[in-house]
């Protein structure tokens, strides 16, 4: 569960390293975001000479959360960190690679390119 002011690790090669959530997109009164939700975030750390710069406002999709999530078949899944992937307004990735595992629920939310680029999907 990600809320405003939460820090997230970036798992693609767009140039950003850390994000801070500003707003959760979707509904008017949404307080928390889970895997597959789109957020608006500010870049807190970045790599020099890359497309995404520090203090830039970007959109991101959450791919991993520390909060455990129960699936319909009874399996509980939890990751070690909160992580996101930077996207543009159309929903396309800004980077070309995704590092680390991602949640399988991204298929259901039509982020199939993120799942196909990731090395593992749990």
From Swiss-Prot:
Statement: the UniProt record of this protein carries the keyword Ribonucleoprotein: yes
Gene3D superfamilies: Ribosomal protein L14
Ranges that cross the membrane: none
GO molecular function, one term: large ribosomal subunit rRNA binding
Predominant location category: plastid
Keywords: Chloroplast, Plastid, Ribonucleoprotein, Ribosomal protein, RNA-binding, rRNA-binding
Any single GO CC term annotated in Swiss-Prot or TrEMBL for this entry: chloroplast
InterPro entries: Ribosomal_uL14, Ribosomal_uL14_bac-type, Ribosomal_uL14_CS, Ribosomal_uL14_sf
Localization, UniProt: Plastid, Chloroplast
Subunit structure: Part of the 50S ribosomal subunit.
Protein name as catalogued: Large ribosomal subunit protein uL14c
Organism: Psilotum nudum
Encoding gene (name): rpl14
């Amino acid at each position: 569960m990600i809320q405003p002011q939460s820090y997230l690790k970036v798992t693609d090669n767009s140039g950003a390293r850390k994000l801070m959530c500003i707003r959760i997109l979707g509904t008017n009164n949404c307080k928390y975001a889970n895997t597959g939700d789109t957020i608006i975030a500010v870049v807190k750390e970045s790599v020099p000479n890359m497309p995404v710069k520090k203090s830039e406002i970007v959109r991101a999709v959450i791919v991993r959360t520390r909060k455990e999530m129960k699936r319909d078949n009874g399996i509980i899944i939890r990751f070690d960190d909160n992580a996101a992937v930077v996207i543009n307004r159309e929903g396309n990735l800004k980077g070309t690679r995704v590092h680390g595992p991602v949640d399988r629920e991204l298929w259901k939310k039509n982020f199939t390119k993120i799942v196909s680029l990731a090395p593992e999907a749990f």
